């Protein structure tokens, strides 16, 4: 393109983005131009292991040929027609998703934030029409340190100052309880105006916080006791990331509502979904909720193939098989580190928490980049380790060496 012929070096691309784009992100200084499988490549063609996976969007690996072909083939025929009409791909996608996960209905949207916003509306409406909560009194309970997006509804449910500072006033009737605290949850759910409890099975953005083994079963039981909808936000934890198709499957519970996003397209297109049974989903009537792009034919075709890849290539099983040894190897190699506070995770949703009073975690990310692996810090103290689920044992062993080598580089300062 003639108008960008001045862009040649990584610095040129970085400065161009900073000049013309809003400063709502603070990226690691690497300029990526292509990707394949578990690898991304910068403008100088240096290869990196991707250990962020677009926040678990590319569970199937970057640019998977089957998903890409499904996308191209559908784009040649029909990309969008709006929900004013029926389309062939949408019904197929809806049937596949509901049968796969065991729910009556699915409502397709575009982003994880939209899935959460949809859940807020769905649960409130169910609260008024089924639970008979007085008008405008419906309350939704969420966990402290959750992350569901940055729309106004989502930040109304947030306790993260960076998300909420100077963005008020907020949507009312969100109550926050500590994560992994059943006693606090039960106390809150005694309020008859509570319609729903929305929870991440593992808190991702909080730093990969894994709850007690009995937590989600306890959540299920308490929600049933007080006639409150149990909503599992599986946008980040779902679709194989933790070693099961859904993270809640580890705990043998079935929430009333499931929220999905990210890997629903394998990173090729924004797709999200809300799943529930008829007694919940059908409180929403025509015209009461929707999206121009939600459930478009292109998204539906991509979604079906992304799920096919996940299942046919046994990526859930791969995450479960490799995740445990990966975590144990890191714990063993880093147990004597002066700067590591904790190593934790489930499947291939893992993290290392550092003693941020001793080390700048951003510096660790930059050193990892130098050593051929990219990821990002969370809350200035934790780095996320979430490779695509197609990673092999040999590749994961190499990445373990990179991570250990990087941590030991900083350990040598003490």
UniProtKB/Swiss-Prot annotation:
PROSITE patterns: AA_TRANSFER_CLASS_3. One of its GO terms (biological process) is arginine catabolic process to proline via ornithine. GO terms for cellular component: cytoplasm. It catalyses: a 2-oxocarboxylate + L-ornithine = L-glutamate 5-semialdehyde + an L-alpha-amino acid; L-ornithine + 2-oxoglutarate = L-glutamate 5-semialdehyde + L-glutamate. One of its GO terms (molecular function) is identical protein binding. Disulfide bonds join 154-163. The disulfide bond between Cys-154 and Cys-163 is reduced by TRX1 which increases OAT catalytic activity. Unlike for mammalian OATs, activity is increased by TRX1-mediated reduction of the disulfide bond between Cys-154 and Cys-163. Binding to TRX1 may also induce conformational changes that facilitate substrate binding. It holds the Pfam family Aminotran_3. Pathway: Amino-acid biosynthesis; L-proline biosynthesis; L-glutamate 5-semialdehyde from L-ornithine: step 1/1. Coiled coil: none annotated. It is found in: Cytoplasm. Its cofactor is pyridoxal 5'-phosphate. It is an enzyme of class 2 (transferase). Its EC number is 2.6.1.13. The modification N6-(pyridoxal phosphate)lysine is found at residue 262. Keywords: Aminotransferase, Cytoplasm, Disulfide bond, Pyridoxal phosphate, Transferase. Belongs to the class-III pyridoxal-phosphate-dependent aminotransferase family. NCBIfam families: Orn_aminotrans. Homodimer. Catalyzes the transamination of alpha-ketoglutarate with ornithine or N-acetylornithine and of glutamate-5-semialdehyde with glutamate and alanine. This is Ornithine aminotransferase. The gene is OAT.
């Amino acid at each position: 393109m003639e108008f960008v012929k001045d862009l040649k070096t990584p610095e040129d691309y970085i400065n161009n983005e900073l000049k013309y784009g809003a400063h709502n992100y603070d990226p690691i200084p690497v300029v990526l131009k292509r990707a394949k499988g578990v690898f991304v490549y910068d403008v100088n063609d240096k290869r990196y292991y991707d250990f962020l996976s677009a926040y678990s969007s590319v569970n199937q690996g970057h640019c998977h040929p089957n998903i890409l072909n499904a996308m191209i083939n559908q784009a040649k025929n029909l990309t969008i027609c709006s929900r004013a009409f029926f389309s062939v791909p949408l019904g197929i996608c809806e049937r596949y998703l509901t049968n796969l996960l065991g729910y009556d209905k699915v409502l397709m949207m575009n982003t994880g934030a939209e899935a959460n916003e949809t859940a807020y509306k769905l649960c409130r409406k169910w609260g008024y029409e089924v639970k008979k909560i007085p008008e405008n009194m419906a309350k939704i309970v969420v966990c402290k340190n959750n992350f569901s997006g940055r729309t106004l509804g989502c930040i109304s449910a947030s306790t993260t100052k960076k998300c909420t500072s100077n963005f008020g006033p907020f949507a009312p009737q969100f109550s926050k309880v500590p994560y992994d605290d059943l006693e606090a949850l039960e106390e809150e759910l005694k309020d008859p105006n509570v319609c729903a409890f929305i929870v991440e099975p593992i808190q991702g953005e909080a730093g990969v916080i894994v709850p007690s083994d009995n937590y989600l079963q306890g959540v299920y039981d308490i929600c049933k006791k007080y006639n409150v909808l149990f909503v599992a936000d599986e946008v980040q934890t779902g679709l194989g990331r933790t070693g099961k198709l859904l993270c809640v499957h580890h705990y043998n519970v079935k929430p009333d509502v499931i929220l999905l996003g990210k890997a629903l397209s394998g990173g090729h297109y924004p797709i999200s979904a809300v799943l529930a049974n008829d007694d919940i989903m059908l409180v929403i009537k025509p015209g009461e909720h929707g999206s121009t792009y939600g459930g478009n034919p292109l998204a539906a075709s991509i979604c079906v193939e992304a799920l096919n890849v996940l299942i046919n290539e046994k990526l859930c099983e791969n995450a479960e098989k490799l995740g445990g040894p990966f975590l144990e190897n890191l714990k063993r190699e880093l147990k004597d580190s002066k700067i590591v506070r904790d190593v934790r995770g489930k499947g291939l949703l893992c993290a290392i928490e550092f003693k941020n009073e001793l080390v700048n975690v951003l510096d660790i990310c930059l050193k990892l980049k130098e050593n051929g692996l990219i990821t990002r810090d969370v809350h200035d103290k934790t780095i996320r380790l979430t490779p695509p689920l197609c990673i092999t044992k040999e590749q994961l062993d190499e990445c373990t060496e990179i991570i250990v080598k990087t941590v030991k580089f900083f350990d040598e300062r003490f």
